[in-house]
Every structure is written in structure tokens, then in C-alpha cells.
């Protein structure tokens, strides 16, 4: 379906880029200054996808239902997806997760996103959400674009921070493998 192909393409780009960026990341780089660190940003990217797709699809979050919260050593709180209003600077600073755990959770959220997008019709995308705090009321398509915006922003921050830590700034042309910073 044309309406969802563009969204699937965009989410696939985030998926592939996150895999390239985290493939050879070290534990020290996941928590290195400046903040927020790469590890927390990668976690947040996946949490935002998980929480929003679960709500849109009327399903339980993978974070809770599939035990990801426990694997991360965190409470299974459905509203905890890294909003600045819920995470303090200290909580972000002490966040720890391996690249493998971050990618495993992201893989699960990506697969759910992909499966969900493949089921949507034009009518589904046009459905208004019952969120009166927003005017006009957002549609499913608008929400998915918001989730995509967050994912792309977080992935861009992750890619920048990797270059910052390894090269002293955004100079991918100086890297041995410039594609690993794309």
C-alpha cells in the first residue's frame, strides 16, 4: 500500500542506520559525555516506537508484555519512555545497557512497527485519535510521523555523538569507514 510504504521505508532507514552505528560501539562510548549519552538515546528511540505503536494498535507494549523492562533492569512503567518530564539528568546519567540489548529491543519494536504498518489502510491512517489536548485532533498518520521524527532525531544524535567521541566532532570523512557514521 502506497500510504504505508513511505513510512516503512523511513522506519527501515532508522533501523539500518542504528544497526550500523551501534555495531562496533564500546561500553564506554554508550555513556560518554556529552549528555544524553548514546545508550539512553538508543533506548528512548525504541521506547517511543514501542509505546506509540502499542497504543495505536491497541496492544500491550513489548516493554511490559515481552519483559524488556526486566531485561533493562527498569520498572515496567508504560508511561516511561524517556520524556524529559519523566527522566532526570541523574537517571539519564546512570542508564546502562549493552549495544546487544539495545539492538535486540529495537529489533523487536521495529518488527512490530513493520507488521503494524503492513496492516494499515488509508482509512486507518485518517482515523482521528481521542486526544483533545491537541487541536486539530491528530490522526494515526500524524502520530506515526511524530514517532518517525523522534526516531530520526534520536538516531541523528546517536550518529553525531559517535563521531564526536571518535573523531572530536562531525568529521565522518576522516573516519576509516565513513559509511559507519551515516
Predicted regions, residues:
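Hydrophobic alpha-helical core bundles mediating ligand binding, dimerization, or RNAP-core interactions
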Residues: 11, 15-18, 22, 106-113
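Short, contiguous alpha-helical
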Residues: 8-12, 16-19, 27-83, 130-182
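Helix N-cap and loop-to-helix transition residues
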Residues: 2, 26, 37, 88, ...
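Acidic/histidine-rich alpha-helical segments that form the ligand environment
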Residues: 77-127, 142-149
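Active-site rim elements
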Residues: 1-8, 30, 96-103
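An acidic intrinsically disordered interaction segment
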Residues: 7-16, 115, 119-123
